Amino acid sequence: MKLHSSSKIQNHAWLSDARMNNPSETSKSPESGDGNTGTQTNGLDFQKQAVPIGAITSAQAQALLGHLHQVQLAGTSLQAAAHSLNVQTKFKEEPGEPMQVVQPSQQPSLQAAIPQTQLMVAGGQIAGLTLTPAQQQMLLQQAQAQLLAAAVQHSASQQHNAAGATISASAATPMTQIPLSQPIQIAQDLQQLQQLQQQNLNLQQYVLVHPTTNLQSAQFIISQTPQGQQGLLQAQNLLTQLPQQSQANLLQSQPSITLTSQPATPTRTIAATPVQQLPQSQTTPKRIDTPSLEEPSDLEELEQFAKTFKQRRIKLGFTQGDVGLAMGKLYGNDFSQTTISRFEALNLSFKNMCKLKPLLEKWLNDAENITSDSTLTNQSVLNSPGHGMEGLNRRRKKRTSIETNIRVALEKSFLENQKPTSEEITMIADQLNMEKEVIRVWFCNRRQKEKRINPPSSGGSSSSPIKSLFSSPNPLVASTPSLVTSSPATTLTVNPVLPLTSAAAITSFHIPGTTGTSSANTATVISTAPPVSSVLTSPSLSSSPSATAASSEASTAGETSTTQTTSTPMTSSLNTGQVMVTASGIHTAAATALQGAAQLPTNASLAAMAAAAGLNPGLMAPSQFAAGGALFSLNPGALGSALSPALMSNSTLATIQALASSGSLPITSLDAAGNLVFANAGGTPNIVTAPLFLNPQNLSLFTSNPVSLISAASAGATGPITSLHATTSSIDSIQNALFTMASASGAASTTTSASKAQ
């Protein structure tokens, strides 16, 4: 299609002619005899665009023409209408040629094969039609539907006369239906279009002329609204906005057809009405004025409203989040606090601010009406539904103030129980007439405060002090629960420093048993106990004032045990009666012994076991030993190498019997205080050939007076005497017991101390 400009206004939009092919008929439109094959366009300066339009098949075109051939109107009326509209088209038809897209840059060789259509302004301006292919296809389908409807409606009319269907789609301005006989004043239209340009309104209207042999003047008026235009109007209101004079021209028996596209595309309403036979004597009406659009709110007005809204909102006592929640309950649209904040800061888009402004105005008026007659603290107003005042209840509660007398009562309850149960908290709250949640929070905070004041430490002192026993040649006082320092001998202070784990074993500590005078030989005291005290005071192992102490410090993860080593120069040489302590394998041997002792019946006693072993039952009264007690020893030699077969059995009774029968465990007497005495009988070389182990789990039987093993019976003996004192009431393992081995010459004045490890 070759386009010529017959005016000084530049062409910017091109719309191809939908060609309806009929192989049997080829003719020209009567309106094309004036030789003007150009297109007259009057409009604004818009960007030139090519519009792709999908093609229709030949079968569809023939079916459409078949219906159009049945429509006939008066030729003179159509000619008068065509001349009044200044629509001049020239149509050259070629059979089987599909609809094509025409661009201004086409070569002249294509001009003969392209239908020529004259486009002109109809109440508006021809501008660039920016349609997607889907929208263009829909537009063609709608045009075909209107042609078919017009053909069916005029099937009873005269044939060989073409009918026109006026299709008007407007989403920007309510356009008035224009009768075909009304001329259009282009100059006045241009003036209106200039006004519209100042308002930034892109009004696009097109007149599509599809002349065929039998359809001499089929005219289509199409108005398309650009996407993104603010002033969109509802499509269903289009027909109601048509003037009465245009409605009078419609056939009473032929309803309009309204087709609305999907929401994804711009709204279009197409009303198909047949063109009436216009009498030639009809007078030319006046120019139709295009109604002006409502101007959207400008930026200054929005800025002023946002500022006013923020001030009034703060004055009413609402937060931005309260406004969003209230609007969601009132109008069904939930708005976040960020949205309200951006509106007040003018950070939203112009479109969104225009949408949000009326909602905020309505909410502000409702909020002011509610608070005008009542205060914000009126609960009836706060709880009334539908007023959007629920946001006030979301405010942070004030800090709870607790009176002094209640605080004192809570402190007293905290000292009694730092972590009460839910029932106890409820009881306290009822007594103090306070809320349960307040009491619960107070206890939580008080416990945290206690942790800050008295932080728990791994090296802290235990609640139970060391219970050391001091024995002397005088009658033994065994019930002293604290450190005994009443000995006239020189005291020795040893710091607990060496950590021991449960798997650690003390290496061999030997007291050489060689004869002869030697000052290098020392008596060794080995003790393992939990760090229940930082300083342990124990009596000296001899009367010598020159006592020395060797201590070392080390620390492990969270737990510290104690190893005490006291060395005292010996005043005389060691005899064969002295004790050699070999502690290698002490943990394994103790565990084996305890395993056998744990399987004893609960009603067993040391008296019964001693009687069964052949010992004199008169030495041990049953009342002095609790049920389940166990007493056993080891054979001479290293603890881990020369164990007796009887010890390996599960019967402690057999162990005691074997030890007693072999003479390695002589029990000589039992003093009046309940102390079991092991002493040297005559010149026996070895009194106790190995360390004596008392089961720590069962030594709790000595609750009143812990057992003290001393050699008081041989106070006047001439030979060397060795005493063994091993008492403990540990509850965990033999490693936490205190083993003391001592040796001296002369009178039996050697004393030892033991600890009670909790």
From Swiss-Prot:
The organism's place on the tree of life at top rank: Eukaryota
Q: Which SMART domains does the UniProt record give?
A: HOX (SM00389), POU (SM00352)
Specify whether Repeat is a keyword of the entry: no
A Pfam family (short name) is: POU2F1_C
Which tissues is this chain's protein expressed in? Expressed in oocytes (at protein level). Expressed in the tadpole brain (at protein level).
Q: What induces it?
A: Up-regulated by notch1.
DNA-binding span(s): 395-454
GO MF, one annotated term: DNA-binding transcription factor activity, RNA polymerase II-specific
Q: Where is the composition biased (Low complexity)?
A: 455-472
GO terms under biological process: Notch signaling pathway; positive regulation of DNA-templated transcription; positive regulation of transcription by RNA polymerase II; radial glial cell differentiation; regulation of apoptotic process; regulation of transcription by RNA polymerase II
Family, similarity comment:
Belongs to the POU transcription factor family. Class-2 subfamily.
This protein is called what?
POU domain, class 2, transcription factor 1
Which species is this record about?
Answer: Xenopus laevis
Give the taxonomic lineage as stored in the record: Eukaryota, Metazoa, Chordata, Craniata, Vertebrata
Name of the gene this protein is made from: pou2f1
